[in-house]
Amino acid sequence: MIKDNWAKAITKFPTKSFDKMHINNNPKHPSIQLIFHNHFNDFLELPDVKKVGIRPVVLKEVEKMLSCGTLDAGFEIYECPHCHNMHIICYTCKSRFCSSCGVNRTREQSAKIRKIALQVPHRHVVFTIDKRLRLYFRKDYHLLNILFLSASQTIDYVFSKMKGKLNSITPGYVLTLHTFGRDLKWNPHIHCLLTEGGITDLGNFIRTSYINYSTLRKGFMKCVLNNMKLALADNPMEFKKFKELVNQIYKDDENGFYVFAPDIEEKKQKDIDSLIDYVVRYTGRPVMAASRITNYNPNKKEISYYYEDHTTSQRVDVTESVYEFIGKLIKHIPEEQFKMVRYYGAYATCNHKLKKFVRFLRSKLNRITFQKIGYRRQLITIFGTDPLLCSCGHFMNYIDNYIPQKWRNDIYEFA
């Protein structure tokens, strides 16, 4: 590896560099990266921000995102054996807060789900919580694990009630966490991709399309509230306030929390790819695509964007300060090592008993598997450009690489 002092000298040489900031530095078509590059340091100096503080993971992910595709992220050096020109290829950050890296991360996540998913009817289920509970999860991000646990407990309970007629069946399901609504406000909820039916102990798939809504709603509410009680039990004052809120919620939400689990048309059942893409869409990138930004004025420090209100299906245009916009985005950055996508039941990686049955059913149902696409092949496929091909037509040879000291513990990130 190149030493730090040598790296500074190397970056002064005239080389061909794949530096993303040159591509995204356009106010008419601003990227999230550009907006944070221009205003994040000033955002950190705001009195309200200083008072509340910033989570360490936010500072780390933003720093990684800002350095993505630049020499600050590290690089590899290549030399053309024919013309002897030097080429530098900058590393990407692989941050969950990076729009461009997130696209690839989401694509890989979708491919992983497609690889394990059976070609059987699935249902999209959305588990929501009472608005009054949202602040608890905002104060303590680790409580978000409760939403996964509660959704899993609810689904397992619903399918256990089917044992009388169908014997024992195990569904396959994938849970993903979304912490936002379309207006970018804090709204944690669970999206679930659930098989309509399950695998028996003999390895057969039995279909059942009926789902008891009442059990789903009331069961999920009970699981969430009980699990939150356990999590808050060590704080007597907080626990007392929460118990009072729980009593009020049971009175107000007699039918349980809202759970959305519509039937999918038969023609859509045959291809769940679009559903998978939607469920994992924002699990590895910022919660808003840059394409929704309609105007950005760096001098006035204003930004305009739009979203579609799901209740009215009408477009809503928003204009606000860049600082307010930044604040909305960073609160959705998950903690380090927090898994936004989790696998359960027949799809659980630790379910060794059903693994062989799932593999057999997948081959029997002609389920197509997907392979991870590497950086080089991805550029060739999408842009028709080979990053290792010199302009003279010869392939370059690898010389050396450089990773900044601060990122060397995360060397796996630069795959």
Predicted stretch roles:
Residues M1-A415:
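Beta->alpha loop/short-helix hinge microenvironment recognizer with preference
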